[in-house]
Every structure is written in structure tokens, then in C-alpha cells.
Amino acid sequence: MHGSAAPSSRTLLVGSGKIAARLAPQFLENGEVYALRRSDSPPPAGAIGIRADLAAPLAARLPAVDRMLVTLPPGDTPAAYRTALTHLAAALPAIPARTVFVSSTGVFDGSGSARPITERDQPGPTSMRSRGLLDGERAAVEIFDATIVRPAGIYGPGREYLLRTVRAGVAVEHARRTNRIHETDLVRTLEMLLRMPEPPRLLHAVDESPAPLGDVVTFIARELGVAVPPDIASAEPGGFVYDGTLVRSMLGRLDYPTYREGYAAMIAGSAA
């Protein structure tokens, strides 16, 4: 009599948004995937759904897993992430061998800086949101020994805020420093961090081309064939510049190395 083979790996996706939905198939190829979410919406195809609200202790135990990706939205208080992660750890039978916690470059706030920010720079958060993000990072490291990923300006199909802004002709601060990463490259980054033997402990997920917002909206406007949005002039440009050397050394060439390739593909896709 032959028993069914045990799965080679078990992956838990905490917060099942678009990123998790794109990652699930990669890990279903050689194991089971669990998708924990607060709502009762269906999990990614093939994944096992778990409905739970991490704002409170979980009523049932979670399955043992080998790896875990945490992509949770900001909470209402600076302690929301720590609370959620504490409840998550209490419901797991053991700490996973690998945890990746998705934070944001939003841990850096304030007036901004033209000097490239690397993973060695320490955030000095001033807002409730940025303080909550930083405390979430610290909790993820303390509780799960997690790798921290800080994406900047995630964009791609379905993430079209800037395209809508340009189409509507809404004024923007042209001199503002901006950074971004295409969703496809972020998914690649997260998959590699979940799989590689010795991942970096902290990673800024940004593309190769930090740029003034005016350059980006001008490119988009020309691709769309519309007027460039008006400028909101400012005495001191805001925003930061993030150094993406580490993520590029890990991934090699990005699928969308700059905003030009990314937005051109989005515009071409929407016109098809």
C-alpha cells in the first residue's frame, strides 16, 4: 500500500494581496502553500486559505511551515505590526526557518535627502506610520529573525495611480525625488529571498533609476499623448534617493530596470 508523499515544503503567505497571489504558484510547484488573510475572499489558486485577524490572538493553531512571507498593511497604531506578529508567533507550532517581512522605504520620512540612502543608513521616523513600520521591522527580527525588505513605489498592472494622475492633469511637484520598483521585480526579489541559503538581512527593493517626479510624468505624458501635468514648485524638493546596488547584485538585470520600461509596458498593455 502506497501512502501519499509528504510535500517537500510548506509556505505561509501572511496577507494575501497581489504579491502573495503571484508568489503562490512558484511554491506550489514543490509543496503546499497556505494563505492567511483577514477577509473571506478566496485564496490564490491552489493555496489553502486560512481566515484570521491578527489583531487578536488566533483561536486555532496554524500549520508548521518552512518559510513565511509577511505582507501586512499598516495598522491604526504604531504597535499594530508588533501585535500582529506576536499573535502570529503564538499560533505557529515553531518559528519558520525563513521569514521575509515586507516593510517600506517609508521608514525614512521628513524633508528628504539627495544623498543616496543605503541599507546601512538608520531611519529616524517622525510620523505614526513610519514609527509603526520601523517597530514592525524590529519585531519581525526579534520574533522571527526575519529578513526585511523595503520596497519603494510599487507599480505595475493594477497599480496605476501615476498613470491616472497624468491622464487627469493633476499638478505634481516636479522636483520631488522618487524611487520605485515594478511589481514583477519585487516578486522576483521576494522569491529569491525566500529560497536562497543566506539572504541579506535588509534590502531596499528599488530599480536602477531614482528620478525627479517631473521626469517620470513627462515620460508618461509623452507616451500617452497628453499634456505634462503642471508643476507644484517648491523651494526645497522633498523625497529621498535610495541606492539599489544590493538588490541588483542579487537579481542581476531587472525585468524593468527603470520607469521607462515599466510604464511603457503598462501603457502598451492598456492599449492592447
Language model: regions and residue ranges:
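Flexible, glycine-rich beta-alpha linker
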Residues: 149-164
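Catalytic helix-loop patch of NAD(P)-dependent Rossmann-fold dehydrogenases
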Residues: 112-148, 172
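Mid/C-terminal beta-alpha module of Rossmann-like enzyme folds, strongest
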Residues: 189-237
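Substrate-positioning beta->alpha
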Residues: 161-163, 172-194
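Conserved Rossmann-fold NAD(P)-dependent oxidoreductase catalytic core, especially the SDR/UDP-sugar
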Residues: 87-126
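C-terminal amphipathic/interface module of NAD(P)-dependent oxidoreductases
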Residues: 195, 228, 235-272
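N-terminal Rossmann-fold NAD(P) dinucleotide-binding loop
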Residues: 20-21
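NAD(P)-cofactor binding segment of oxidoreductase domains
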Residues: 61-101, 135
